[in-house]
């Protein structure tokens, strides 16, 4: 546990609550002190849905600490069972309430005797895993619970559907453009004459989970959630899965070829060929292929970018930048430290350096050092970009409200390639745009940013030096500012004047 004002991945209970609130008619009870119960507010603010967040906080207060939690937790489970009549109630502690070392499984067993709903305790170690790992584990736990229950009751139907079909696993609440990606994946599968059997957890019912084995294969678009479930289904029900993220032209084609392989394995006498579809989509439907060869995109050749995000999006965007658009990636990184090996394997050869960290100050210092033309990252990298005057395109969670768009903005599939190409191209400052604005005035009244990125700096710019900095063209201003600050630190100078600026320039050119 650590104190931070920014976290890329939240605590474990947030992942569990995201999965529980994605299902229909599932209620989550969070055993937590006041302050840990911000999930309701966060989801209500960000997710553009009409329904209330199905999460109740069973507050740990002084009375609970004096008398124990059992009575309160069991009462809350029974009350929600009567009020909401959910199919499933998920009980989860938080990392704070886990300190009490209570036997919550005993509370669940006791509540199960009087509740009409199924009741389970989220099987997650709150000290060892983060939000994404907990979400992956909770989804697998819920799927396992209902499939084993159906197997015991003899109601499990494992006969495959007549036509090729797939389960889409890993679309869930507060995900980055997840709803749009889901629509695009459905459209992609429909074009391939593959029916969608189930989408979980988003909008799915736990009662329908016993139908999962009827699909021919599982599609897992994101590594962060769904992979454990797909591995469980493969091991216990022999269901193959495709885990190639269909992001960008090359990887979308590769994903479709994997789907073709699994479909042909099940119907060897009636093989399908998706190559004509891939060819048509790449040449005529996706605009990204010809755009990447156009004169507009060639303006970006040799420009340097930095990428940072979750493992799935950061790896995919890095490959798109380097392989499909000819942009040099100075550094690519992820905050998914648990997936470091896979990430390194995916981006090897596509970037100059790799960074795996969940400390935003390390990311900020790396960006300041590399001085890229554009950043592709999370909400935090957008803030860093604003402070350094570097444009930023948001490509990964965690994000704020502007990345839960009302319009159709998928990142996956062939329509996703168009969105990504737009995002990449529009993120770079074009030509002399900034400089012309400064020369001719216009309506751009922003002041020069003189704050340094590092939080421990004590450098200040006086008024005259700020005016002097303002005269420098925007496309080199950031570099000159950083070089001047570096010179000042080396010489133990705390206030930067015009004289210091010229001294720094002379020292650099010497």
UniProtKB/Swiss-Prot annotation:
Its cofactor is [4Fe-4S] cluster. Its EC number is 1.3.7.7. Gene3D superfamilies: 1.20.89.20, Nitrogenase molybdenum iron protein domain, Proto-chlorophyllide reductase 57 kD subunit B. Pathway: Porphyrin-containing compound metabolism; chlorophyll biosynthesis (light-independent). CDD domains: Pchlide_reductase_B (cd01981). Substrate binds at residues 431-432. One of its GO terms (cellular component) is chloroplast. Pfam families: Oxidored_nitro, PCP_red. One of its GO terms (biological process) is photosynthesis, dark reaction. Its main location: plastid. This is Light-independent protochlorophyllide reductase subunit B. The gene is chlB.
């Amino acid at each position: 546990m650590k104190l931070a004002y920014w976290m890329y991945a939240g605590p474990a209970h947030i992942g569990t609550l995201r999965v529980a609130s994605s299902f229909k008619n599932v209620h989550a009870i969070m055993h937590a002190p006041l302050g840990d119960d911000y999930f309701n507010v966060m989801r209500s603010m960000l997710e553009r849905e009409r329904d209330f967040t199905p999460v109740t906080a069973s507050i740990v207060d002084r009375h609970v600490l004096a008398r124990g939690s059992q009575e309160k937790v069991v009462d809350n489970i029974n009350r929600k069972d009567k009020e909401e009549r959910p199919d499933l109630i998920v009980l989860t502690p938080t990392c704070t309430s886990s300190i009490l070392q209570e036997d919550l499984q005993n509370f669940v067993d006791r509540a199960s005797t009087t509740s009409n709903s199924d009741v389970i305790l989220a099987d997650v170690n709150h000290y060892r895993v983060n939000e994404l790992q907990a979400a992956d584990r909770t989804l697998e736990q819920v799927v396992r619970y209902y499939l084993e229950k159906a197997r015991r009751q003899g109601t499990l139907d494992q006969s495959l559907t007549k036509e090729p079909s797939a389960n889409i696993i890993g679309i869930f609440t507060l995900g980055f453009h997840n709803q749009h990606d889901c629509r695009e994946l459905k459209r992609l599968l429909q074009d391939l004459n593959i029916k969608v059997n189930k989408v979980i957890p988003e909008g799915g019912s736990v009662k329908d989970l016993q139908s999962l084995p009827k699909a021919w294969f599982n599609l897992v678009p994101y590594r962060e959630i769904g992979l454990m479930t797909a591995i469980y289904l493969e091991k216990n029900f022999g269901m193959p899965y495709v885990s190639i993220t269909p992001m960008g032209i090359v990887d979308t084609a590769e994903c479709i070829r994997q789907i073709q392989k699994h479909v042909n394995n099940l119907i060897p006498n009636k093989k399908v060929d998706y190559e004509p579809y891939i060819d048509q989509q790449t040449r005529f439907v996706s605009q990204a292929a010809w755009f990447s060869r156009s004169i507009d995109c060639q303006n970006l050749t040799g420009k340097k970018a930095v990428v940072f995000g979750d493992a799935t999006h950061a790896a995919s965007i890095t490959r798109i930048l380097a392989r499909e658009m000819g942009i040099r990636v100075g550094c690519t990184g992820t905050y998914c430290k648990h997936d470091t090996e896979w990430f390194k394997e995916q981006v090897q050869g596509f970037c100059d350096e790799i960074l795996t960290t969940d400390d935003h100050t390390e990311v900020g210092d790396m960006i300041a050092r590399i001085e890229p033309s554009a950043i592709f990252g999370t909400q935090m990298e957008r803030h860093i970009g604003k402070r350094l005057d570097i444009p930023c395109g948001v490509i990964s969670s965690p994000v704020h409200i502007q990345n839960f768009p009302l319009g159709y903005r998928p990142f996956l599939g062939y329509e996703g390639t168009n969105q990504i190409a737009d995002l990449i191209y529009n993120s770079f400052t074009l030509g002399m745009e900034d400089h012309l604005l400064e020369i001719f005035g216009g309506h751009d009244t922003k002041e020069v940013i003189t704050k340094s990125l590092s939080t421990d700096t004590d450098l200040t710019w006086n008024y005259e030096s700020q005016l002097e900095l303002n005269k420098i063209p925007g496309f080199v201003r950031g570099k000159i500012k950083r070089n001047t600050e570096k010179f000042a630190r080396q010489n133990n100078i705390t206030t930067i004047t015009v004289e210091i600026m010229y001294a720094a320039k002379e020292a650099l050119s010497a």
